[in-house]
UniProtKB/Swiss-Prot annotation:
Family affiliation: Belongs to the Msh homeobox family.
Annotated keywords: Developmental protein, DNA-binding, Homeobox, Nucleus
Record-linked InterPro entries: HD, HD_metazoa, Homeobox_CS, Homeodomain-like_sf, Msh_Homeobox_Regulators
Segments of skewed composition (Basic residues): 116-125
Location in or out of the cell: Nucleus
Record protein name field: Homeobox protein MSX-1
DNA-binding region per UniProt: 122-181
Gene Ontology BP annotations: BMP signaling pathway; embryonic morphogenesis; ossification; regulation of transcription by RNA polymerase II
CC terms in the record's Gene Ontology section: nucleoplasm; nucleus
Region (Disordered): 1-125
Organism of origin: Gallus gallus (Chicken)
Biased composition (Low complexity): 71-83
Function: Probable morphogenetic role. Acts as a transcriptional repressor.
Length: 249
């Protein structure tokens, strides 16, 4: 009997995929409520640690991502290879390539920046002179270009100016008079230079040159033919002309 019952039951083929066997009783609703009331949390699984199955086997853990080790000597080796590849090129350079004619020009040095003169911070503001003060100063300068200390004190008090202002004005006026005098001397030198006659006065024509040319134009049979007049060369009078022009200047 027992054999027949076993033969009547369908045989279940074993699953090719592995499965985990569950140990313990199935979770019920009451047990779930107890866990929630206790604040139970499912343990978090770390990818770096292998997971253990209930049947004692271990699952393959996911490989942890770690940065690849950096080789310190790789950069130095690459730089060394680049330097070695440059050396034969430099050694094989021809002399005309190394000549300064074909080499690039050196970079030009920039000119230094122009530094402006800075005025003093405690510089006093410039006080403009009135028209009456300028006329009095100019009149005094024409009388006397250098004032003594007593004259300067008296003159400055009469114009309601300080002695320093009068002193500086006279210094500037003397410098201006010197510049004007030098300009006048330069003009006199330019005017005193003798004016040389131009080169056209030295050109001499052959005797009877223009007359001969006129005769050839009209021809021998022309009724309007005129006798040729001798023309003296201009070069004979160049000395007299130059002498008269020199004295005229």
């Amino acid at each position: 009997m027992g054999g027949e019952e076993e033969s009547d039951k369908p045989k279940v083929s074993p699953s090719p995929l592995p499965f985990r066997r569950w140990k313990g009783s199935w979770p019920t609703a009451e047990r779930g409520r107890q866990r929630r009331s206790r604040g139970f949390r499912a343990p978090s699984r770390r990818p770096s640690q292998p997971r253990r199955s209930d049947d004692g086997g271990t699952d393959v853990a996911a490989p942890s991502r770690r940065p690849l080790p950096v080789r310190r000597g790789a950069g130095q080796a690459a730089r060394g290879r680049a330097a070695q590849s440059r050396e034969p090129r430099e050694a094989g350079a021809t002399p005309w390539m190394q000549s300064p004619r074909f080499s690039p020009p050196p970079p030009r040095a920039e000119p230094p920046a122009c530094t402006l003169r800075k005025h003093k911070t405690n510089r006093k503001p410039r006080t403009p002179f009135t028209t009456a003060q300028l006329l009095a100063l100019e009149r005094k300068f024409r009388q006397k270009q250098y004032l003594s200390i007593a004259e300067r004190a008296e003159f400055s008090s009469s114009l309601s100016l300080t002695e320093t202002q009068v002193k500086i004005w006279f210094q500037n006026r003397r410098a201006k008079a010197k510049r004007l005098q030098e300009a006048e001397l330069e003009k006199l030198k330019m005017a005193a230079k003798p004016m040389l006659p131009p080169a056209a006065f030295g050109i001499s024509f052959p005797l009877g040159g223009p007359a001969v040319a006129g005769a050839s134009l009209y021809g021998a049979s022309s009724p309007f033919q005129r006798a040729g007049l001798p023309v003296a060369p201009v070069g004979l009078y160049t000395a007299h002309v130059g002498y008269s022009m020199y004295h005229l200047t």
